[in-house]
Every structure is written in structure tokens, then in C-alpha cells.
From Swiss-Prot:
It comes from Rhodopirellula baltica (strain DSM 10527 / NCIMB 13988 / SH1). Belongs to the acyl carrier protein (ACP) family. This is Acyl carrier protein. The modification O-(pantetheine 4'-phosphoryl)serine is found at residue 37. It holds the Pfam family PP-binding. GO terms for molecular function: acyl binding; acyl carrier activity.
Length: 81
């Protein structure tokens, strides 16, 4: 099974149409990948579905980079990187 990081990168790549090679933990959804507010809502929904978690709106607003999404999911799933 793919790691959380690999699965998040796959989802971001697919949702935003970006090559996986351009996505790192430091990649900003808005500044680096050009995501708009609708893109970020769709990403959050996709991540919630993939990992069977709930991301509250206040937490979702704080997730600006790929690594922050990975860290949040790992914390929710009780896994350490």
C-alpha cells in the first residue's frame, strides 16, 4: 500500500492536473500550483474520502502546503512519518 505522502501527491496531481515531479512537501496549493478556492474545497473533499477522515473548515483553511495536508492526515490517522 502506498504511503500517506504518496497518496496525497497522487490526489493533488490528479485534482490539479500537475506532474507529480513538481509536487513536494513545501509546494503551496495556491502559490505554486495555482489552485483557487474551488480547487482547494475539492481537494479537501477528495482527501477526506480517500483517508476516511473529516477535515473541519478551520483546519482546512490552515492547510496551505502539501506537507501540511500530509501532517494533518498522519495526525488524524495516528501515524508518524
Amino acid at each position: 500500500m502506498a504511503s500517506i505522502e504518496e497518496r496525497v501527491v497522487d490526489i493533488v496531481s490528479e485534482q490539479l492536473g500537475v506532474d507529480k515531479d513538481k509536487i513536494t512537501r513545501e509546494t503551496s496549493f495556491v502559490n505554486d500550483l495555482g489552485a483557487d478556492s474551488l480547487d482547494t474545497v475539492e481537494l479537501v473533499m477528495e482527501l477526506e474520502e480517500e483517508f476516511d477522515i473529516s477535515i473541519p473548515d478551520d483546519s482546512a483553511e490552515k492547510i496551505q502546503k502539501v506537507g501540511e495536508a500530509i501532517d494533518f492526515i498522519e495526525k488524524e490517522k495516528g501515524e508518524d512519518a
